[in-house]
């Protein structure tokens, strides 16, 4: 339904800023390498019940801050209950709907630009 790229990274426990580690993961995973700059990364640290959702510049410019806050609310609601999978599924569905509005799928031109697998970070480097 969308040409946007959604990725998930699950990280082991670590101390420090989840956002700064997520930003490094965003770069490491090539999230800025998409033609339309429309990648979204869900960075999850289950042991801390923490997450960060990052979007590349074009999706951010089109959806605004309210969208990111709504995704965070969905994740937070479920994470507080330990429902990591359910929260992530709901947030990814919402992200996909918004991506489809702004970056619709075109079978003639769409290329899967990033891997579809979940990233499991084995170590965190500061």
Regions found by a protein language model. Name each.
Residues 1-125:
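Divalent-cation
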């Amino acid at each position: 339904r969308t040409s946007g790229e959604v990725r998930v990274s699950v990280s082991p426990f670590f101390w420090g800023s989840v956002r700064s580690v997520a930003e490094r993961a965003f770069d490491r995973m090539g999230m800025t390498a998409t033609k339309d700059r429309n990648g979204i990364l869900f960075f999850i640290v289950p042991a801390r019940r923490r997450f960060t959702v990052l979007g590349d510049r074009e999706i951010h410019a089109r959806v605004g801050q309210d969208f990111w806050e709504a995704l965070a609310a969905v994740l937070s609601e479920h994470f507080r209950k330990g429902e990591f999978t359910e929260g992530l599924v709901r947030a990814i569905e919402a992200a996909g709907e918004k991506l489809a509005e702004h970056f619709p799928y075109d079978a003639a031109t769409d290329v899967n630009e990033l891997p579809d697998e979940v990233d499991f970070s084995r170590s965190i480097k500061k």
